Curated annotation (Swiss-Prot):
Ranges annotated as spanning the membrane: 127-147, 168-188, 206-226, 245-265
Record topological domains on the Extracellular side: 148-167, 227-244
Compartment(s): Cell membrane
Name of the protein described by the UniProt record: CASP-like protein 4A3
GO cellular component: plasma membrane
InterPro entries in the record: CASP_dom
Provenance organism: Arabidopsis lyrata subsp. lyrata (Lyre-leaved rock-cress)
Biased composition (Basic and acidic residues): 43-72
Keyword Transmembrane: yes
Similarity comment: family membership: Belongs to the Casparian strip membrane proteins (CASP) family.
Chief location: membrane
C-alpha cells in the first residue's frame, strides 16, 4: 500500500469550494432563464463574481416583481368579494320574492274565500226572503178570504162590510197579498235568471219603505179588528160571525210578523246594494 503524504490526504478530504457555488447556481433557476444564452462553467473567481451579480440582481428583480404581485393580488380578492357580495344580494331578493309571493297568494286565497262566503250568505238571504214572501202571500190570502166570507143570514144576520174595522183589515190584507205576490215572483225570477223584473237603483229603498208601511198598517188593522170583536163578544156573546172574524185577525197578525222580518231583510239589502 503506497504511503500518502498528509498534504495529499488533506487535499483529498477537503471538499472543493466550488461545490457550494455550483449548488447555489443550480438553485437559482430564474437567473438562468433570464439570460439570453446559457453560460459555460467558469472558474471559481468567475462563479463568485456571478454570485455577486446574482445577489445584486435579486433585489432588483424582487423590487420589480413585488409591485406586480401587489397589483395582481387584490384583483382576485375584489372579484371574489364582488361575486360573494352579488350572491349575498341575490339570495335575499329571492327569499323576499318567495315570501312576497306567499303573502300575495295568501291574500288572493283569503279574498277568494271572502267572496265565496259573501256569495253564499247572499244566496241564503235571498232564499229566506223568498220564504217570508211566500208566507205573506199565503197568510194574507187566508186572512182576507175568511174576512170576506164572514157573513151570516137570517133576521139576525150580519156582515163584515157593516163595520169599518173589518173593512180596513180586509183592504190591508188584499194590498199585502198583491205586493207580496209580486215580490215573490221577482225573487224567484232573480234566483233563476240573476236579474230582477224591474231594475232600478231606488228599488231597495222602495222595498224597505213599503215593507215598513205594510207592517205598520197590518198591525193597526189587526188591533182595530180585535177591538171590534171584543166589543161584540162583550155585548152579544160568541157566535160564528165573531169566530170567523177572530180567525181572520189571527192570520192578519201572522202576516204582520212576516212583513216585519221582510222589512229587516229589505233593510239589509238597502245597506248592501253592491250585492244586488
Amino acid at each position: 500500500m503506497p504511503s500518502m503524504s498528509p498534504s495529499s490526504i488533506s487535499t483529498e478530504k477537503s471538499p472543493p469550494p466550488s461545490d457550494t457555488s455550483m449548488a447555489i447556481v443550480a438553485f437559482d433557476n430564474s437567473t438562468t432563464h433570464l439570460s439570453s444564452s446559457p453560460s459555460p462553467p467558469h472558474s471559481l473567481d468567475h462563479s463568485s463574481d456571478s454570485e455577486k451579480e446574482d445577489e445584486k440582481r435579486r433585489p432588483e428583480s424582487r423590487r420589480n416583481k413585488n409591485p406586480v404581485k401587489i397589483e395582481e393580488t387584490p384583483s382576485p380578492i375584489v372579484v371574489v368579494h364582488n361575486h360573494n357580495r352579488s350572491v349575498k344580494e341575490v339570495v335575499p331578493t329571492r327569499k323576499t320574492a318567495r315570501v312576497g309571493s306567499g303573502r300575495s297568494s295568501g291574500q288572493r286565497s283569503g279574498a277568494v274565500l271572502a267572496i265565496l262566503r259573501r256569495s253564499r250568505r247572499e244566496e241564503i238571504v235571498k232564499f229566506v226572503a223568498l220564504g217570508f214572501r211566500l208566507s205573506e202571500v199565503v197568510l194574507a190570502l187566508i186572512s182576507f178570504s175568511i174576512m170576506a166570507a164572514d157573513k151570516t143570514k137570517g133576521w139576525s144576520g150580519d156582515s163584515f162590510d157593516r163595520y169599518k174595522e173589518y173593512r180596513f183589515c180586509l183592504s190591508v190584507n188584499v194590498v199585502a197579498f198583491i205586493y207580496a205576490s209580486f215580490q215573490a215572483c221577482d225573487l224567484a225570477y232573480h234566483l233563476v235568471k240573476e236579474k230582477h223584473l224591474i231594475s232600478h237603483h231606488l228599488r231597495p229603498l222602495f222595498e224597505f219603505i213599503i215593507d215598513q208601511v205594510l207592517a205598520y198598517l197590518l198591525m193597526c188593522a189587526s188591533t182595530a179588528a180585535v177591538t171590534r170583536v171584543d166589543d161584540w163578544v162583550s155585548n152579544w156573546g160568541k157566535d160564528d160571525f165573531t169566530e170567523m172574524a177572530s180567525a181572520s185577525i189571527a192570520m192578519s197578525f201572522l202576516t204582520f210578523l212576516a212583513f216585519a222580518f221582510s222589512s229587516l231583510i229589505s233593510g239589509y239589502n238597502l245597506f248592501n246594494q253592491d250585492s244586488l
